[in-house]
A protein has these predicted regions:
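Non-catalytic, topology-defining segments of multipass membrane proteins
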Residues: 1-154
């Protein structure tokens, strides 16, 4: 794989509005999307090299809780379901904060979640448990078929 191909795949992670994917594309795992998740978990092992402190542990815990709040309250409740109203500053801040949880952007997340609700637990539900445990939890977003933002769902 050429350096330009790798660079292009990294860039479209952030902006895939011009990416066209055929309906019949394979559900094979795209390993360029797996590498960041493997690296993210391997980096955690560096704690055995650099050590840890109670402050670092509290910062990690607070960071985790804040990111999960951003995903639950804003990505899920606000962007996907429009369950409450908020100002542009809160939308921006929690949208950026949620994206640091490596769950892509709020529009991508909301589009796939809305599609999930339309087809809940049927064949067109892209992360239904009917497709298997690993697929429903992480396989679905690591393949090219489900990579683009489903703009018609937002």
């Amino acid at each position: 794989m050429s350096l330009q191909t790798v660079f292009t795949k990294v860039l479209i992670w952030f902006d895939n509005s011009n990416v066209k994917i055929a309906d019949n594309v394979s559900e094979a795992i795209d390993w360029m999307r797996v590498i960041p998740f493997i690296l993210m978990h391997l980096v955690c092992l560096l704690v055995f090299v650099v050590g840890w402190s109670p402050v670092a542990l509290w910062v990690a815990l607070a960071s985790y809780l804040l990111r999960m709040f951003a995903i639950t309250a804003f990505y899920h409740r606000y962007f996907s379901h429009k369950a409450f109203k908020t100002g542009r500053i809160a939308q921006f801040l929690f949208g950026v904060l949620g994206s640091t949880a490596t769950q892509r952007g709020p529009i991508w997340w909301a589009s796939h979640h809305r599609r999930h609700h339309v087809h809940s637990d049927k064949d067109k539900d892209i992360h239904s448990p009917r497709h298997g445990f690993l697929w429903s939890h992480m396989g679905w977003f690591l393949c090219l078929k489900n990579f683009t933002t489903q703009e018609h769902c937002v």
